[in-house]
Structure formats: C-alpha cells, structure tokens
C-alpha cells in the first residue's frame, strides 16, 4: 500500500502517460482513499467501499496504461481482463468468478516473489552449498569448499556443467482436473494425487549459471511458510486488489436492437454481485470482493454508457472521459515520457553499436504521419506510433549488424525517405500502416 498523495500519484502517471488529466485525478483519488480507509477505526472501516470507475474513450488513449501504472504504484495485485471473454453462467465459456481466481493466482506469485527477497541471503548461501556439493562431493574438506565458493562468487565456474536434484514440477495427474473445477473449491483430484506423489525430485544436468535461480528459488521456498504466503496474498487481494475490465461496451445490449443478446446481458448480471461485493471460492480459500477496486473501460463507439444495465451503471459511480490524442500529444509521447519509443529504439540500436539521434523535425514528422493515418484510416490512438516507428526503422534494424559504429540521424528527410510514399498513398497506408 502506497502513501503517495493524489498530486504525487498524478505526477508519477505523467511520466508515462500524456494528457488525460481527469482520468489520472480519478484513479489518484481512488488510490488515496484506500490509504485513508486504512487509517479509520475498525467500526467504520468496513463501511467504506471503493468508488468504482468507468473510463470512456477511444482505443489507444491510455485507459489500460493508467490502470497498469496505478497498480505498480500501489504495489497491489492487478488483473486486466476483457469482458468479451466471459459468458453467462450455464453457457460454454469462462464465468466471471474466474476473474477473482486469476487475481488470487497473480497475488500468490507476487507475494511469494516478495517474500523470497526477504530470505534471499540465506537462500543464496544454501544454493551455493548445493552447487559446491555437486562439484566437490559431499565429503569435501572445508578448505576445498571455500576454494570453490570463492571461484563460484567470481563467476569462474559459470560454464561448468553439474548434475543436481531439483523438484519435479510436472503433475501427471493434471488431466484429472475438469476445466476450472479445481479453482472452485470443489474436489481437485489432480491436486490431491499431486500431493500424494509430491516431493518428487529429478536429476538434471545444467550449467552453474543456469542452476543459480532454480536452486535459489527452491531454497527460498523451503524457508517460506506456504500458509503465510496464502494468507498474505488473500489479504492483499481483498484489501488492495485492482481489476481492470476492458471492452465493457462490447457486452452492452444496444437499446435500438431487437431481441437483446441474452449472453451479453447475462455477463453484466453476473458482474453485478462481483462488483457489489460477494464471496468467491478459490483453491486458496474464500475471497470477499467488497473492497476490490473495479475499473471498467470501453470505447462506446456504438453502444452508450446508458445501454449498460442500470444496476451496473450504479456500481460504477465515477465516470471519466478520455479524449482522442492529437498530433501535439504524439510529439510529447515520443519526446517526454520515460518509456518513449524513441528511447527504446536508441537503446535497441546501441546494442549493435549504432548511434541514433532524433531531431525535433524528425519527431514532428513521425507524429504528423501517425496522426494523418489515424484520420484517414482508423483512429487507434498512440498504438499507431508503434507501426510508424517499426516501418521507419525496418531497413536499419535489418542491416544494423553491418553498420556497427555508425551514427544515424532521424530527421524529417529520413522519415520521408523511409515512410513518405506509404503515408501519401491512402490505399497502401490502409494495409501497411
């Protein structure tokens, strides 16, 4: 749980996402309210529920990125799902309860990784002992062990092939699990038999370098209490979990359509108790969804937010509209953000010892072409920049190993040379860009 103020949260989001001030403020307040709730006394804390958010805006404007960055800031369990993947209970497909089960699975992995860090020093020592034992034998003298330990730390043994016993992670009984049943608190035959045959090990040959992470994770897991990991992960999900439901507009039954799609409306009805607050059975234990923050998003090109079930609209009280991105926004995305594509391509080409310099005119030309193709073909927002950049660098990326030591300046002329003809031809850009 982070104690950042709303202003600090927005400032952090500004490093990666251009514009969309309203959406940033809404999620910043929602996250800060989590911290405020923690400060309350027990009698009122359970009465304070998160205000779920509905983001409305075209594709590629930052809806998903805002939620993903928010979860990283909060160090909270996060899951992104598409509403279109789910079907009403009773139909073939996934039911919405699997959202919470997937969120718990993600939280278990995150919690275990974080707890491994706490015991890392002891785990590294134990992993080193196993490597030394595999090289020098169990009966080696202490002096010999210390000699090998020194070589190991200096990396002199990294290429040495050793044979070690590691846990056998394959589960031959997995086929006994009906799809999803093991997740539902029902009898999980695969897990029962897996435990019966559990503790199995297998001997594997690998280099010392390859064995490091495998053995360290095994030794760390021996030092962790599985029940503590589960309890911590479940608490994190219930108190801090964030679920991002994309494409919510695709499960709207439009008011102007005759005979509404039963399954679409059914998905909305199944989402109601989940967002309102219910208890979902998972293989790690029951999870209450009352205090999980749900952020739904959709483009709403055809359907309208009012086409959602009235009950679902009421459970998404905060609405923010994200505007379409302009050419000026694209210039800022390419030059100001911490994860700008220009920086990424510079770093990629640097591995081939090719220097890249972007001029201001070059960045403006890239932004101009992306905006023009969005206008003339289909507006996919900032994602268009990926296509444009890949096209501009296609030739250089292919020949980079042969151009080691060169310096390349990406200016307006360079962009025109690599992309101009494609951008001008509407027919070509429709298929290529």
UniProtKB/Swiss-Prot annotation:
Keywords: ATP-binding, Chaperone, Cytoplasm, Nucleotide-binding, Stress response. The keyword Secreted does not apply. Disulfide bonds: none annotated. GO terms for biological process: protein unfolding; proteolysis involved in protein catabolic process. Its main location: cytoplasm. GO terms for cellular component: HslUV protease complex. ATP binds at residues 18, 60-65, 246, 311, 383. Pfam families: AAA, AAA_2. The keyword Chaperone applies. One of its GO terms (molecular function) is ATP hydrolysis activity. It is found in: Cytoplasm. A double ring-shaped homohexamer of HslV is capped on each side by a ring-shaped HslU homohexamer. The assembly of the HslU/HslV complex is dependent on binding of ATP. HAMAP family: HslU. PANTHER family: ATP-DEPENDENT CLP PROTEASE ATP-BINDING SUBUNIT CLPX-LIKE, MITOCHONDRIAL-RELATED, ATP-DEPENDENT PROTEASE ATPASE SUBUNIT HSLU. Belongs to the ClpX chaperone family. HslU subfamily. ATPase subunit of a proteasome-like degradation complex; this subunit has chaperone activity. The binding of ATP and its subsequent hydrolysis by HslU are essential for unfolding of protein substrates subsequently hydrolyzed by HslV. HslU recognizes the N-terminal part of its protein substrates and unfolds these before they are guided to HslV for hydrolysis. This is ATP-dependent protease ATPase subunit HslU. It comes from Cereibacter sphaeroides (strain ATCC 17025 / ATH 2.4.3).
